[in-house]
């Protein structure tokens, strides 16, 4: 008997997708990732579809991959998926030089990022009924 190749770090109701070395700065990518955190997966995909930011299409592709992983690898219900986390991390930084006036040069840094999206099945919470809004006299009498 051999050991499993890797230990599953996620819960059974979760799936993930990772995009590495995306050519955008982590700061800009985090703006798009913040849009989809804690959103239902279908609403997050719709928001990314109509986002005007360039990187939104790559984030959408990664989110769709996480949803596909949940459906095909873990048999989760696609309609119940919610974006649990969208983590953004730093990757490499390419250094380049830009020619300036008088024979000088300036250093240009091109940032890369990592993106990890975890989707989870939302737990069905029982519907809570709001108490009726009566006057203070009714509340004191009860």
UniProtKB/Swiss-Prot annotation:
Q: Which gene encodes it?
A: rplV
* The protein's role, per its UniProt record: This protein binds specifically to 23S rRNA; its binding is stimulated by other ribosomal proteins, e.g. L4, L17, and L20. It is important during the early stages of 50S assembly. It makes multiple contacts with different domains of the 23S rRNA in the assembled 50S subunit and ribosome.
Which keywords has UniProt assigned to this entry?
Ribonucleoprotein, Ribosomal protein, RNA-binding, rRNA-binding
The name of this protein is Large ribosomal subunit protein uL22
Q: Name one GO molecular function term.
A: rRNA binding
Record-linked PROSITE patterns: RIBOSOMAL_L22 (PS00464)
Where do the record's region annotations for Disordered lie? 122-142
Which organism's genome codes for this protein? Gluconobacter oxydans (strain 621H)
One of this protein's GO BP terms?
A: translation
Q: Which family does it belong to?
A: Belongs to the universal ribosomal protein uL22 family.
